[in-house]
Curated annotation (Swiss-Prot):
Gene coding for it: RPLP0
PANTHER family: 60S ACIDIC RIBOSOMAL PROTEIN P0, LARGE RIBOSOMAL SUBUNIT PROTEIN UL10
Biased composition (Acidic residues): 303-312
InterPro entries with a match to the protein in the record: Ribosomal_protein_uL10 (IPR050323), Ribosomal_uL10 (IPR001790), Ribosomal_uL10-like_insert (IPR040637), Ribosomal_uL10-like_insert_sf (IPR043164), Ribosomal_uL10-like_sf (IPR043141), uL10_eukaryotes (IPR030670)
Organism the protein comes from: Oryctolagus cuniculus
Subunit record text: P0 forms a pentameric complex by interaction with dimers of P1 and P2. Identified in a IGF2BP1-dependent mRNP granule complex containing untranslated mRNAs. Interacts with APEX1. Interacts with FMR1 isoform 6.
Upper taxonomic lineage: Eukaryota, Metazoa, Chordata, Craniata, Vertebrata
GO cellular component: a single term: postsynaptic density
Residue(s) of cross-link: Glycyl lysine isopeptide (Lys-Gly) (interchain with G-Cter in SUMO1): K298
Keywords in alphabetical order: Cytoplasm, Isopeptide bond, Nucleus, Phosphoprotein, Ribonucleoprotein, Ribosomal protein, Ubl conjugation
Protein name as annotated: Large ribosomal subunit protein uL10
Family: Belongs to the universal ribosomal protein uL10 family.
Pfam families xrefs: Ribosomal_60s, Ribosomal_L10, RL10P_insert
Crosslinked residue numbers (Glycyl lysine isopeptide (Lys-Gly) (interchain with G-Cter in ubiquitin)): K264
One BP annotation, GO: cytoplasmic translation
Any GO molecular function: large ribosomal subunit rRNA binding
Length: 318
């Protein structure tokens, strides 16, 4: 490619990334390891109208951003995260929705020898369908097996590869023999940039319910601390009032001092049997109307059954 064309392409790329950074207030920094051109094309098509994917050399992306810092100083937060095989996904839509679309575009992939495992791989207990001649292969990997109807059967689940481990040739061969594609590759969100703020993608998993529960937990902690040190706050005052009322009530019971709300408690302590006797009476009074309502229903049901008997012909010779 001639130097002039290359220079023109670079200039257009700089203009494009600057325009995208100005037009879109939100973007993802995504890792693109093991993502092929065909899969990238499918991702672009699925995001069409909702987001724009931009890939490029890290040096060019950094240079374009540094040249635009005068107009938008917040972009400097992106620079430390532009390393490795990364790109941008720009959007104006809900970030969680775009995240879910990226996850939906992951494709299963077979294990390759020498690759770094992005997740844990467990081989489930199963009949492999492989002949007995492969027994030594399983023994070398420490997998307990038995011969069942002329084929090898794995007796229990086996953790074959841990996250971050390098896939060995034997592990890759076994997974391929069992037709297991343990990995899935796609654009992996590494950082989220939202209106000048940058944060981890785990923040997108925080829902309103999560915020509500954490807020209530914080209120409870504040109330507990304030009660212990005797410092009144909005969170602790209701508990302080209740505790104070309990103390006054206890003092009233132990002394001759009384007030209207304490009279019932004193009466109960003086004669608990009176309250026990009153409980069945109250229960009976509530049960009586229910029984009265049920009685006509039973009579009605009986009359209906007699009528149905007559309809069936049981009174034919009466």
């Amino acid at each position: 490619m001639p130097r002039e064309d290359r220079a023109t392409w670079k200039s257009n790329y700089f203009l494009k990334i600057i325009q995208l950074l100005d037009d879109y207030p939100k973007c993802f920094i995504v890792g693109a390891d093991n993502v092929g051109s065909k899969q990238m094309q499918q991702i672009r098509m699925s995001l069409r109208g909702k987001a724009v994917v931009l890939m490029g050399k890290n040096t060019m992306m950094r240079k374009a951003i540094r040249g635009h810092l005068e107009n938008n100083p917040a972009l400097e937060k992106l620079l430390p995260h532009i390393r490795g095989n990364v790109g941008f996904v720009f959007t104006k839509e809900d970030l969680t929705e775009i995240r879910d679309m990226l996850l939906a575009n992951k494709v299963p992939a077979a294990a390759r020898a020498g690759a770094i495992a992005p997740c844990e791989v467990t081989v489930p207990a199963q009949n492999t369908g492989l002949g007995p001649e492969k027994t030594s292969f399983f023994q070398a990997l420490g997998i307990t097996t038995k011969i069942s109807r002329g084929t090898i059967e794995i007796l229990s689940d086996v953790q074959l590869i841990k996250t971050g481990d390098k896939v060995g040739a034997s592990e890759a061969t076994l997974l391929n023999m069992l037709n297991i594609s343990p990995f899935s590759f796609g654009l992996i969100i590494q950082q989220v940039f939202d209106n000048g703020s940058i944060y981890n993608p785990e923040v997108l998993d925080i829902t309103e319910d999560t915020l509500h529960s954490r807020f209530l937990e914080g209120v409870r902690n504040v109330a507990s601390v304030c009660l212990q040190i005797g410092y009144p706050t909005v969170a602790s005052v209701p508990h302080s009032i209740i505790n104070g009322y309990k103390r006054v009530l206890a003092l009233s019971v132990e002394t001759e001092y009384t007030f209207p709300l304490a009279e019932k408690v004193k009466a109960f302590l003086a004669d608990p049997s009176a309250f026990v006797a009153a409980a069945p009476v109250a229960a009976a009074s509530t049960a009586a109307p229910a029984a009265a309502a049920a009685a006509p229903a039973k009579v009605e049901a009986k009359e209906e059954s007699e009528e149905s008997d007559e309809d069936m012909g049981f009174g034919l010779f009466d």
